[in-house]
């Protein structure tokens, strides 16, 4: 428990958007930012358990900050932060795929969105205990290295078949359009169209 508290306090000492906002609140209210952060986390947890739109809030938490950090990583000259956020997005995509197929079952568990949010926060935490890096190195990378040759071969075959299919469909559509245009094009006549005669009464 002390290790978790020390990590929490180290996080509060870092410079980022959240800690700057907590620092401003601390200056206004006189309440220490660790208590403010703990209160905000407790409210967030309660809302994820009982609030309306917990799914949306959980997805926003799992997407907004990582997207912001990814753009900053792209713009920075360092490659290390790029690797961290690419790894996060690989884990996020894999988690989304698993969740898509298991959502009908997991949706009924009352703590599902709180657990999902905790998992996503674990995956984006900075430092050596980053969940995305742990999952990548212990689960995803070994599976990828074991099966990537077969996956590359299957992807190559599928892309070749898709290109052949697209070329065949394009050829058939162009031929159908050419035949249709030949049928629709009227024969040219030298006589002008007859004028309409009105019957005066």
Curated annotation (Swiss-Prot):
Protein's UniProt keywords contain Transmembrane: yes
Subcellular localization: Endoplasmic reticulum membrane; Cytoplasmic vesicle, Clathrin-coated vesicle membrane
Family from the record: Belongs to the DP1 family.
Keywords recorded for this protein, A-Z: Cytoplasmic vesicle, Endoplasmic reticulum, Membrane, Transmembrane, Transmembrane helix
GO term, biological process aspect, one: detection of light stimulus involved in visual perception
Single GO cellular component term: apical part of cell
InterPro entries (UniProt xref): TB2_DP1_HVA22 (IPR004345)
Protein name as catalogued: Receptor expression-enhancing protein 6
Tissue expression remark: Expressed in the inner segment of rod photoreceptors and outer plexiform layer of the retina (at protein level). Expressed in liver, but not detected in brain, muscle, kidney, retinal cone photoreceptors or retinal ganglion cells (at protein level). Highly expressed in the ganglion cell layer of the retina and in liver, and also detected at low levels in kidney and testis. Isoform 1: Expressed in the retina. Isoform 2: Expressed in liver.
Subunit structure: Interacts with STX3. Interacts with clathrin.
Gene ablation phenotype (knockout): Viable, however mice develop progressive deterioration in retinal response, and male mice are sterile. Progressive retinal rod dysfunction first evident from one month of age progressing to almost undetectable scotopic response at one year of age. Progressive degeneration of photopic response by retinal cone receptors first evident at one year of age. Defective retinal morphology with significant thinning of the outer nuclear layer and reduced rows of nuclei. Accumulation of vacuole-like structures at the apical inner segment of the retina.
Presence of the UniProt keyword Manganese in the record: no
Cited function: Required for correct function and survival of retinal photoreceptors. Required for retinal development. In rod photoreceptors, facilitates stability and/or trafficking of guanylate cyclases and is required to maintain endoplasmic reticulum and mitochondrial homeostasis. May play a role in clathrin-coated intracellular vesicle trafficking of proteins from the endoplasmic reticulum to the retinal rod plasma membrane.
Organism: Mus musculus (Mouse)
Mode of membrane association: Multi-pass membrane protein
TM annotation in the entry: 36-56, 89-109, 117-137
């Amino acid at each position: 428990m002390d290790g978790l508290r020390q990590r929490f306090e180290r996080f509060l000492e870092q410079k980022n958007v959240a800690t700057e906002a907590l620092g401003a609140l601390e200056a206004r209210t006189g309440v220490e930012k660790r208590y403010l952060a703990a209160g905000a986390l407790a409210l967030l947890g309660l809302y994820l358990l009982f609030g309306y739109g917990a799914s949306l809030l959980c997805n926003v938490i799992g997407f907004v900050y990582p997207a912001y950090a990814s753009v900053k990583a792209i713009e920075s000259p360092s490659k290390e932060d790029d690797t961290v956020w690419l790894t996060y997005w690989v884990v996020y995509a894999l988690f989304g795929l698993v969740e898509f197929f298991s959502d009908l079952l997991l949706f009924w568990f009352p703590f599902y969105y709180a657990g999902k949010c905790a998992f996503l926060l674990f995956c984006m935490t900075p430092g050596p205990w980053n969940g995305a890096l742990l999952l990548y190195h212990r689960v995803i990378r070994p599976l990828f290295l074991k099966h990537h040759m077969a996956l590359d071969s299957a992807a190559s075959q599928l892309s070749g078949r898709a290109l052949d299919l697209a070329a065949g469909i394009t050829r058939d559509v162009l031929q159908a359009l050419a035949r249709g245009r030949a049928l629709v094009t009227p024969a040219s006549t030298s006589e002008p169209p007859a004028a309409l005669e009105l019957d005066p009464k």
